[in-house]
Amino acid sequence: DQHKKDTLAAGAGLCDIKAVDVLVSEGPEAVRKLIAQGAVFDKSETGEIALTREGGHLRNRILHAGGDATGAEVSRALLAAVRGDTGIEIIEHALAIDALKSAGGDVCGVTLHVIGAGSRDGVGRALAKAVVVATGGLGQVYSQTTNPAVSTGDGVALALRAGAKVADVEFVQFHPTVLWRDLANRGQQPLISEAVRGEGAILLNQKNEQFMVGKHPQADLAPRDVVATEIFNQMQISGQP
């Protein structure tokens, strides 16, 4: 299967084979479930879901919504589904602080600080049979990142304090292409979608040279770590961002 081959190639020997098998075999059904939940993806003139390419892929297999607003659309659809389920309680404007543990040492909930008009102001707790830490990245520990303002690594810290083992923390992804402003700008920076290159855009250096040619067989659509490394090399050579 080409999708599996592409994933393993981009993983450079670091992939969990079982996880890759789950990704490529269950991915299409997961997309169908998202559509059933109300997610709307961009379509071609024929009415089929429009697919494009991103780094590391040899085929067009990336679907999108509203151009480059795919994440927002998926979040919208899932949040609407959650709000429509009377069996789920949503606590908004809440900062999870620490994991709660039972007398036996098992995690059984979290302490949280809820702030905002109309909310339960102050420190409280939420009990649960299972706690899933899904807090996103930690890019905001760096002065410049394409990660949103909420990507502060709080979830990783919470897990560490609870005694969980954290793996692969060195794999902090920096998106290769960002709209440069200047060094005075801190925090979240404007991301230039990889799909732009998937539709034919090319990367040029200060000399208008297509510098990814010869660096990787897929050139501008090489895996992100390869593209990011070569962009960094070009910056070092030119002394320019």
Language model feature labels by segment:
Residues D1-L23:
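Glycine-rich active-site loop/strand segments that organize a redox cofactor
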Residues L14-A19, V31-E48, E89, K165-D168, ...:
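A short alpha-helix-loop-beta-strand transition element characteristic
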Residues A128-V131, S151-L158:
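Extended, hydrophobic alpha-helical segments in both membrane/secreted and soluble proteins
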Residues V133-T146:
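Flavin (primarily FAD) binding-site architecture
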Residues L158, A164-P241:
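An anion/pyrophosphate-binding glycine-rich loop and adjacent beta-alpha core
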